[in-house]
Amino acid sequence: VRQLLYPRECPFCGRVLGDVRDCPDCAVQLETLRRKPGIRLDPAQHYISNLAGAAAPYRYSGCVRRGILNAKYQGKPWRAVEMGNRLVQLAFGGELTVQYGELLPQPVPWAAIGYDLIVPVPASGKRRGYNVPELMALPLAKAMEVPLAPQALERTRAKRHQAGLPLEQRIANVAGAFRAAQPQQLEGKRILLVDDVITTGTTAAACAQALLH
């Protein structure tokens, strides 16, 4: 019944997929958008201070960009969950299977060795009623068997949109914009920080700074 009422869609183009795991329309473009030779970001090209490392499976362009924008601004939160499934697969080598029209990540408990907690970057506003990074983190938490802590970080103030700003202004824009809600519960924890988009890395670095202090 669920599959008939809410058929599974491609998170990038919206095509109804049903029991088909991967969208044939987006497969070729997604392959061209894959970061190669690996998904880890170069610290020389990104501002990722305070982070042990950072990774992004795809470049923010084409169908990937459209999928994220639709999830954020077109009221399609389930697309964020689907993209989170791709993170399980591409970042941690997890297997994905389709059961009754739903894409499900298989457990990857070995990955839990590296993290004690998964923390999504908090939403910039409450208008949409959901937080895309949190939804993307749900499949990761399930597959890795690591607790998800959506309230660990909170924003202290609104910030300007980062798009189009030079690096110096991006750094200033997010400076002090986040704080750890319950720092005593984070002490000594190995944290996986999840965001929907990383360009220069300034937002992730500001979140890491808040978690560390």
Question: What are these model-derived regions, one by one?
Answer:
Residues V1-H213:
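Glycine-rich phosphate/pyrophosphate-handling loop used in enzymes and phosphotransfer proteins
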